[in-house]
Amino acid sequence: MPTDITVNDRTYHWMDRPLVVVCVDGCQYEYIAAAVAAGVAPYLGRLIAGAGTSLIADCVMPSFTNPNNLSIVTGVPPSVHGICGNYFFDPERGEEVMMNDPRHLRVGTILAAFSAAGAKVAVITAKDKLRKLLGFRMKGICFSSEKADQVSLAENGIENVVDRVGMPVPSVYSAALSEFVFVAGVKLMERERPDLMYLSTTDYIQHKAAPGTRIANDFYAMIDRNLARLDELGATIVVTADHGMNAKHRADGQPNVIYLQDTIDAWIGKDKARVILPITDPYVMHHGALGSFALVYLAAPADQHAVAGRIAALCGIETVLMRAEAAARFELPADRIGDIVVVSQLDTVIGTSRDRHDLSGLDVPLRSHGGTSEQKVPLLINRAIVKQPATRRWRNFDAFDLGLNLVTRAS
C-alpha cells in the first residue's frame, strides 16, 4: 500500500486504523451541546471534555447539502470541485437542473483515490440524491438508506442490506432515515471493516426541532450510541456537518420570506430576471424550498448594479454581491452563479414567487439554512491531534486532513 495519497493538491497519509468521517446534516453545534447537557449524549460529552478534540469550523457557502458534502469528500471548496448548490441554472443547457449528476463534478474525490490505491472504502448516505456524486469513480460499497432495498453487487458493491441492518427502509421524511445510515455503518465496521467510511445523514429533524427539544435530543442520543460503538470497534471518528440550522419565522410562526422574483418583477417587469434558489431539491416538504441564499440572473447587464442596490435595501437582506466578488469571497465557480448573489439575515429566507412555493408541508414553524448565519459547524475527533496554529481557520472539508494527517497515530 502507498504511504501517501495526493488529491486536489492535498496530501493524505494512509490510515493506520479505520477512519469514519460523519457528516451530520444540519448540525448546528448547539444541538450537540444541548444533548450533552441533558445527559443523553455521554460519548460526545467525553470527546468535548477532552477525550477527543472539539473544534468549530466553517462550512462552505452556500450552506447547503451538496456543496458541503462534496467539499468534505474532495478536501476543497466549490470553486475547485464545481458543485455550488443542490440546484442551479445550467448555461450550457439554458435550463434549471438538479446538481446531482457527477458530470457537474470537476475533480476527483478522496474516496475514489483511496479506493483506486487499494483501500476498502464504503459510503452510506441517507438520501439517494447524493449517492452518485459521493461514489463518483469509487470502487467499494456505496448505497443510500432511501433505496437500501434496491441494492445490488454490481451497482452498490453490496446486497441484502435491509436484512443485514435489521430495519425496514425508512421514509425520506423521518429520523429513521439517518438512523439507518448509522446502524448500517456499524454493521459494516463489524463485518467488512472498511479502511475508510463516509456516513452522511439528512437534516429532517433539525428542520423540525430546535436544539434541546425532546425530538432533537432523542436524535442525538441515537447518534451518540452509534458513534460510541464505532469507537469500540477501533475506528478513528471525525464528526462534522454540512451546515447549521436556524429559525426563519415571524413571531406568529409564519415563514419570514422575501419573495425576490415577485419583488424584482415589480421593479423591472416580468421575464427580465430569473431568481434561482440553490436549496431546491426533490425533498421540499420540510423547508418549502426556502433558504437564505439566492442567485439572480438579469437579461440586461445594465440593470445589474441598480437591481443589486435595491435588493440590498430590502429588510432582511444581509449581503448582496456581484458575480466576481461573490466568487472570490465565497469560493464559488463564477460560471455557475448568477449576476447577483443574495444572502439573507439569520431569521429570513428568500423565495422566488409566492405561488411557486408549496408550504402545506410545513407543520411546524420554518427552520432552514443557506446563509453565513449557518456556516459555523462542529468538527469533533475522537483522538488528540498534533498542535495547530491558533489562527488556523478550520473548515468542514478539513475532516480527512484531521483524520489522516493530524490525529495522533496509533502506537
Q: Which residues make up each language-model segment?
A:
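Active-site-proximal N-terminal segment of extracellular/periplasmic enzymes that hydrolyze or transfer
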Residues: 1-52
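A long, amphipathic alpha-helix that forms part
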Residues: 13-14, 174-239, 243-247
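Active-site metal-binding loops of divalent metal-dependent hydrolases
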Residues: 26, 241-245, 346
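Short catalytic/ligand-binding loop motif for oxyanion handling, primarily in non-cytosolic enzymes
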Residues: 29-31, 81, 129-135, 205-209, ...
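Short, structured active-site-proximal loop/turn typified by the sulfatase FGly-forming signature C/S-X-P-X-R
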Residues: 32-76, 122
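His/Asp/Glu-rich, glycine-adjacent segments
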Residues: 71-210, 286, 292, 298, ...
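Acidic/histidine-rich catalytic neighborhood
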Residues: 228, 245-297
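Active-site neighborhoods of enzymes that stabilize oxyanions during catalysis
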Residues: 277-411
